[in-house]
Design a protein with these regions (language model features):
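Sec-dependent signal peptide recognition
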Residues: 2-10
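Mature soluble binding/inhibitory domains
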Residues: 18-294
Length: 294
């Protein structure tokens, strides 16, 4: 037994010498192997504010420009022209529209006065004229009157003078205004009768606001028997809501209508009446009139 123990001790000593003198106990735990390094969990980066994107530029709301006053428009005077032209129409009277230009001349309004300017022509000549202005409340409403002229025409080698007479009414149509109260009017008529040109008569009108009725008389001088009753039958409602009117004309000695009066009231409270007269046959007589409240 002691012998076996000695051999065992000796074997141990010899093994220890062969291993560098270090004695490793067979009961020591195996050396700990390093665990593979695990990557640290990625920490979330603090959220960075996204750079502010410029918002698309919005057009600034258009500011209304201050309203500019519109330039004042000149008044326009239009109406009728009744013409007897022996060259063009023989003895017939022609009632046509008028805008200031007759072909032979033009009429413009300068500082409240109608001015006639002859158009350039070597064979047309103005021989006379009379134009009267019509105003209300210091405002020009229009004008009426006549212009006489002649033209040289060569017919079959002969130089002939052909006469023309124009009876003109030109008013500012925007000033038509029906009167609100009964009123009397007095004025003039310029007319042509059977070729006698530039004649003048008186006109008296009465407006009855209760009946919307216009009556009156036209009275010529003693040398020219030019007398008419206006709406002698006294028919009511011959003045319309828009301020225009129409009435038959009869001679005192005749019972039937001989012609027609057409016109309108103009200006403040309808203080002016103006229009045309024309015979039923469009040949015997015709002209224009203007009258103011009395």
């Amino acid at each position: 037994m002691n012998f076996k123990l000695s051999i065992l001790v000796l074997s141990v000593i010899l093994w220890g010498c062969s291993s560098g003198g270090k004695v490793a106990s067979p009961w020591q735990p195996a050396p700990q192997q390093p665990t593979p390094e695990q990557p640290a969990p990625e920490q979330p980066a603090p959220e960075q504010p996204s750079p502010e994107q410029p918002s698309p530029e919005q057009p600034s709301p258009e500011q209304p420009s201050p309203e500019q006053p519109s330039p004042e428009q000149p008044d326009v005077y239009t109406g009728r022209i009744i013409t007897r032209d022996s060259y063009v129409n023989g003895n017939k009277l022609i009632n046509d529209g008028f805008n200031g230009d007759s072909g032979i001349y033009t009429i413009s309004v300068d500082t409240g006065t109608p001015v006639i300017t002859p158009n350039t022509s070597e064979n047309e000549h103005i021989t006379g004229h009379q134009l009267q202005s019509l105003s209300s409340d210091d405002k020009l409403l229009g004008y009426y009157g006549y212009v006489l002229s002649y033209a040289d025409r060569e017919i079959l080698g002969q130089n002939e003078k052909y006469h023309r007479s124009d009876y003109i009414l030109a008013m500012n149509e925007s000033e038509i205004n029906k009167p609100t109260a009964s009123a009397q009017y007095h004025g003039n008529v310029f007319y042509d009768r059977d070729g006698a040109v530039g004649q003048k008569a008186n006109i008296d009108l009465f407006y009855d606001s209760n009946k919307s009725m216009l009556t009156g008389t036209i009275t010529g001088d003693s040398q020219r028997d030019f007398n008419f009753l206006i709406n002698n039958d006294q028919k009511s409602n011959n003045v319309f809501e828009d301020g225009t009117f129409i009435a038959p004309l009869t001679e005192p000695s005749q019972g039937s209508m001989q012609g027609v009066l057409n016109g309108a009231f103009y200006g403040k409270n309808g203080e002016v009446a103006a229009g045309t007269i024309m015979s039923s046959d469009n040949e015997s007589w015709g002209g224009v009139f203007g009258a103011k409240v009395q």
